[in-house]
Amino acid sequence: MPLSNNYRRILAALLGAVMLASCAPTVIPAGETVRAPALEDGRYVAADGTSLPFAVWLAANGAPRAVILGVHGFGDYRNAWEEPAEIWAAAGITTYAWDQRGFGASPTRGRWAGTQTLAGDILAVARLVRARHPGVPFYLAGESMGGALALVAADQGADVDGLILLATALRSRDTLGPVATGGLAFFAHVVPWLPVGPTSIDFQPTDNPRTMEKLRKDPMILRYPRVDLGYGLVEAMDAAKEAAPHIAKPYLMLHGLGDRLIPQDPVRSAIALMPRRPDSHLGFYRDGYHMLLRDKEGPVVAKDIVAWIDDKRAPLPSGADAERTRPELAELWGSKRGG
């Protein structure tokens, strides 16, 4: 007996639901706790036993006067911090960085770990690094996605003395718009395995040809991520947007005016809600792109960071303070916080 139209609709709906369920975005969060987290032989070993490559650039001439923990961006890995770390080392600052889950040489490369798992790793690594350097000023630095995750970790009580936010990924769903957000959700649930491109490399993330060449040749760069990895990134940016108004530490927030990946509109939306503090700065670089620390003027940015660590109330040496480069954004800063 042929099926009625109603039965066909019900079966089609059920089949569609099964297909969507079977193709949900892949998330590989941290597993059960099996040990105490530790830094061992160039690795960060998490509480669930996951082992992630870890790097350190030691301060020149002995004990550091400050320590920076770097959190890399989407598709990147620990070596994102190599160039600025050399400048900071010469200034007496030690830098640490690791490959986050899903990136670099991590065992789950190409799979999203979940915002809370990634933020949890930041909290754990920060505790371990802080324990290595008791009494030394300690800063959490994040680039792009790393900046978003740094905001989330700070909101969850990361034990640091300040935040350094570089080209922070703040393109939350409310700034992407319903079409882009809906399209991403559709593809992430229907074909989560689909590799997407072009990646940030093809959107000219820097004006530095040497950096571009290194990115193209480096096998550790994730060039064609799955669409569900991008869906996870948006989740992280949503969480960062929610966390941004609650920053309770000094912070240095830097963006390039030539950034094609994180345009000014999402930045404007976030800074209007962020606390305006005398020990914090907004900086905008006229010739800056997305990878500020690896641009042609990367050393200028790295030295601004050193200057801020030394004196948080003084203007940045480069003149990048928003009051000089983008006074309208300086005026917007903290303007929508209310009472």
Predicted features and spans:
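Short beta-strand/loop motif that positions the catalytic acidic residue
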Residues: 247, 253-255, 259
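Catalytic active-site module of serine/aspartate enzymes centered on a nucleophile-bearing elbow/loop
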Residues: 281, 286-339
